A protein has these predicted regions:
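Peripheral interaction segments used for macromolecular assembly
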Residues: 1-129
Length: 129
């Protein structure tokens, strides 16, 4: 596998594995995602998990579209979100525009290392190694 083209070896798609999380509350699938300016961005469609540590690393947030048509997907590092006290929704620590202008993710193409790096850099985070 060439550098920058394949997925980080220890991240797996939670929807496509029987892996369980060390902390079950980290399964954020289905939760609505809001921005700091209270605008709804979308919802968590999937979670990428560190296979060895069994911890959530990246959220796949789906936004827009009608019946799946025109839907866009964005990756958000879990460090960028906070869960409300009732646990029913997440807030990204940025305005809605910041998230919707982030590098777009195509679930059909899978998670590639170069996109992961771009997402972590976009949010000012270090790429995990």
């Amino acid at each position: 596998m060439q550098e920058g083209t394949g997925p980080q070896p220890n991240l797996v798609n939670l929807n496509e594995t029987d892996l369980y999380l060390e902390e079950p509350w980290q399964d954020l699938r289905g939760l609505d995602v809001y921005a700091t300016n209270n605008g709804q961005i979308g919802s968590v469609e999937d979670v990428y998990v560190d296979r060895e540590q069994r911890e959530a690393r990246l959220l796949v947030v789906s936004a827009g579209g009608l019946l799946g048509v025109g839907k866009k997907h964005f990756l958000v590092p879990v460090q960028e979100v906070k869960r409300d006290l009732e646990g029913e929704r997440l807030t990204v620590e940025h305005p809605k525009e910041k998230v919707t202008q982030s590098p777009e993710f195509n679930p059909d193409e899978g998670l590639k290392a170069d996109l992961q790096r771009a997402v972590y850099a976009y949010y000012g985070r270090s790429y995990p190694t």
